[in-house]
Amino acid sequence: MLAFENILQRIESEISQLQFTNPPKSLYEPIEYILSLGGKRIRPALTLMACNIYNNSIENAIKPALGLEVFHNFTLLHDDLMDEADKRRNKPTVHKVWNANTAILSGDAMLIAAYQLIGSTEHGHLKQVLDLFTQTAAEICGGQQFDMEFESRMDVSEEEYIEMIRLKTAVLLACSLKTGALLGGASQEDAGNLYAFGINIGLAFQLQDDLLDVYGDTATFGKNIGGDILCNKKTFLLINALRLANKEQAEALRSWMDKKEFDPAQKIQAFTSIYNELQLKQLTENKIQAYYDASVENLKALQVAPEKLTILKEVCDHLMHRQS
């Protein structure tokens, strides 16, 4: 089995060799910029790790893995534009370095580049991998639409929110794992269990992101703390705050959410104080643990030697205890 560090090194090496040589250069500079910002590279890493569980060689999974990473960064580029985010990985976002129109068009070019890379999948697995990716891409768009619609709703349920983050975040992790498994020669049953593992770990991952947006550190998180609060984004914490708040707390939350002009630090502090009063940090951590426990059961169902799953388990354990 390849070490996680070796897999990451291979991914970074392959990304650095990606060439966008078609004119005009200005269309592709933002793509090179966002890919150069780094990141966890967890999606391509999951693809290669899943492949490696079933096959000593990961070569046939390299290009599809790169395609999934390019696609992921495309979603971030458009996400940042829609959220009007200033920072991504502690660097200015694409629409801040260039402009909104450039971010839209370069993002479109990234989506095409992702399809080109995934289209390089070996013929025997091409249809299944491409179908899975296309379904995933459509689901992610649906998740983003739900996310935007939730911003103007005050009655979003926890169940609706979980479905939204399943679509927006978890399905791509699941797709990455299943793609790697299929290319490694896994059975359909094992590929399905790895997909379910990806869903559960993805839900835990996004809930951890919600938590870090409130309780993280800007220096390590790579994004401004409280960004979701400032945008009135319906996160797991806000949805449960609105559900559990007493009359006074509910009025305070709604008052802040209705304000068009406010001091950002004061709004973040006000929300955080109410979250603390309602013990939402613990509630969120309990939910994260539940999805993590479910993901462990998915791995136990795999028809492989337990030692082959050691690296995958270690990486996911690290994700669940991250600060960035």
Regions from the language model: what does each represent?
Residues 1-324:
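All-alpha prenyltransferase/terpene-synthase fold signal
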